[in-house]
């Protein structure tokens, strides 16, 4: 159901195109990420969520900003699809572009303050910033390689998307789903409610089962956990960029059966294009289904649906 693609293989662009036209999800192996960097980021996430609650709340997301700690039960992702559900059973910590990038970008467009807000770092973990910044940069480089393969799969030049993502507004999010052995969920409650992602591409590393996607049959399907692989899914922006040829698929994280109700951890890299990049159809032989829109405006319109 969810194809596994070796990124370096010659047939990768064609296989990516096929996956994105159908399920909108695939997994990549042979991605070349440094396992030392990956392990350091994973440990950093574990260390952060193990902090006392007061230390985590000290770096809570400031009002009007995008990055920092999101407490347990603070988010309802399904609200983005208009669903009224109980809050999600997870806690998060998100980081955005570096302070240097943020300062430069804000001088050009104050309207971008949300995506270019500063990341608050916990003083109790002084090594956290270096570990996560290195991982953030490595994942951004991987997405650039991935989007080159995607461009080829769409019949475009390999560097087609590069000018639109060289000052990307991406976010790295650590997610912790606490142990649910002794917790009884409310009706309709999820670890993460059904939603689609807003940006171009999402990369996900996960520790255990629970992620489900809507298949072409309309049913929910499990995404298997494959050691060393990254789950990739298409976001709303890339769906629009491809004139809806590719699917931004609804997905969720469910509460598993009693055998797998222990804690779960994942790290997601939500890649977004440059704030001022213009999203318009790259499919030359079809009439555009959507008017052109800046990536920044598109992203903010999506965020506002959950406020």
What function would you assign to each model-found segment?
Residues 1-307:
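Peripheral, non-catalytic segments flanking oxidoreductase cores
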């Amino acid at each position: 159901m969810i194809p596994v693609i070796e990124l370096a293989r010659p047939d990768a662009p064609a296989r990516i195109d096929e996956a994105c036209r159908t399920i909108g999800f695939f997994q990549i192996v042979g991605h070349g990420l440094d396992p030392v960097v990956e392990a350091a980021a994973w440990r950093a996430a574990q260390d952060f969520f193990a902090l006392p609650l007061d230390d985590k709340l000290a770096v809570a997301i400031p009002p009007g900003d995008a990055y920092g700690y999101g407490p347990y039960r603070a988010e309802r992702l399904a609200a983005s699809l208009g669903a009224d559900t109980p809050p999600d059973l997870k806690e998060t910590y998100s980081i955005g572009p570096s302070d240097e990038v943020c300062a430069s970008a804000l001088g050009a467009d104050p309207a971008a303050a949300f995506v270019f807000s500063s990341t608050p770092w916990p003083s109790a973990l002084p090594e956290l910033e270096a570990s996560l910044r290195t991982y953030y940069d490595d994942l951004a480089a991987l997405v650039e390689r991935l989007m080159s393969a995607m461009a080829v799969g769409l019949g475009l030049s390999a560097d087609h998307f590069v000018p639109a993502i060289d000052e990307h507004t991406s976010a790295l999010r650590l997610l912790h789903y606490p142990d649910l052995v002794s917790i009884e969920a409310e009706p309709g409650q999820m670890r993460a409610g059904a939603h689609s992602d807003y940006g171009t591409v999402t990369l996900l590393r996960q520790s255990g089962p629970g992620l489900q996607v809507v298949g072409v049959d309309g049913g929910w399907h499990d995404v298997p956990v494959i050691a060393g692989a990254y789950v990739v899914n298409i976001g709303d922006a890339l769906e629009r960029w491809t004139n809806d040829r590719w699917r931004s698929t609804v997905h969720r994280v469910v509460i598993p059966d009693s055998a797998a109700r222990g804690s779960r951890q994942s790290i997601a890299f939500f890649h977004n294009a440059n704030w001022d990049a213009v999203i318009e159809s790259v499919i030359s032989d079809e009439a555009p289904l959507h008017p052109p829109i800046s990536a920044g405006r598109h992203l903010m319109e999506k965020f506002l649906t959950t406020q």
